[in-house]
């Protein structure tokens, strides 16, 4: 499903550049710091300054931004407003992306109430659960529908991104339903490995894995070692 442009076709990337996945993963981190700088009325930032804010080294910042065609000005740095626009455009944040959340337990409910989605162009258009007690509940103006209604909702309001926040044992079933409904991008919070067709983009967020990684570094710190990855 194609997203809706928020400000006309000129907001789309000029070309589909080949950008390394590691660089793509850092762009939202740069963007967050740039928003903070902009809110503080800072108009320019050096690669060193941006690197300090983001916890990376300056050479990596310069290399990452060069993939966007942004090289900054020697002795001045990067224009914060221009860089904000470049990264937002590259990440597709100048378009509206309709999203659906399946699973309205504690995590799903929190995601549905998160106001930060709208500020980045992610519009919640569907909320789904299998619990009869939740059906009909309004969350930020969006009604919770039964998961069986997913195909009908997707036909009426195409969904670009589906978020899975269900128990692990039903995650694959939910993923299959999203794919069957025409959803081509899925973010999986469920503690399970799921498979999707090659045409579908899948991202996995596993909080337990992140905690185990932190446990590894905490153990090293306690033993007097280095904490940095």
Which sequence ranges carry the predicted segments?
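Flexible, compositionally biased loop and terminal segments
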Residues: 1-14, 63, 85, 158-159, ...
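NAD(P)-binding Rossmann-fold cofactor-contacting core
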Residues: 118-140
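Glycine-rich Rossmann-fold phosphate-binding loop(s) that bind the pyrophosphate
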Residues: 104
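HTH-adjacent hinge/linker in prokaryotic transcriptional regulators
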Residues: 44, 48, 53-99
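Phosphate-bearing ligand-interacting subdomains
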Residues: 33-38, 140-229
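Hydrophobic/small residue at the entry helix of a nucleotide-binding pocket
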Residues: 107
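Extreme N-terminal segment that seeds HTH/winged-HTH DNA-binding domains in transcriptional regulators
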Residues: 1-43
């Amino acid at each position: 499903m194609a997203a809706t442009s928020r400000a006309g076709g000129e907001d789309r990337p000029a070309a589909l550049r080949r950008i390394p996945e590691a660089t793509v993963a850092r762009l939202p981190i740069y963007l967050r710091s740039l928003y903070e700088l902009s809110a503080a009325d800072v108009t320019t930032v050096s690669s060193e300054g941006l690197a300090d804010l983001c916890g990376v080294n300056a050479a990596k910042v310069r290399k990452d931004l060069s993939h966007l065609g942004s090289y900054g000005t020697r002795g001045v740095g990067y224009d914060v407003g221009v860089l904000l626009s470049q990264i937002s455009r590259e990440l597709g944040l100048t378009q509206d992306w309709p999203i659906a959340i399946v699973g309205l337990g504690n995590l799903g409910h929190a995601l549905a109430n998160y106001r930060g989605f709208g500020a980045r162009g992610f519009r919640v258009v569907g909320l789904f659960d299998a619990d009869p007690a939740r059906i009909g509940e309004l969350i930020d103006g969006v009604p919770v529908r039964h998961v069986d209604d997913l195909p009908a909702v997707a036909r009426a309001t195409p969904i670009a991104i589906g978020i899975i926040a269900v128990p692990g044992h039903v995650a694959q079933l939910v993923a299959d339903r999203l794919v069957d409904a025409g959803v081509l991008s899925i973010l999986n919070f469920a503690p399970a490995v799921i498979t999707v067709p090659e045409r579908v983009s899948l991202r996995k967020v596993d909080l337990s894995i992140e905690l185990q990684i932190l446990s590894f570094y905490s153990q090293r710190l306690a033993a007097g070692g280095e904490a940095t990855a």
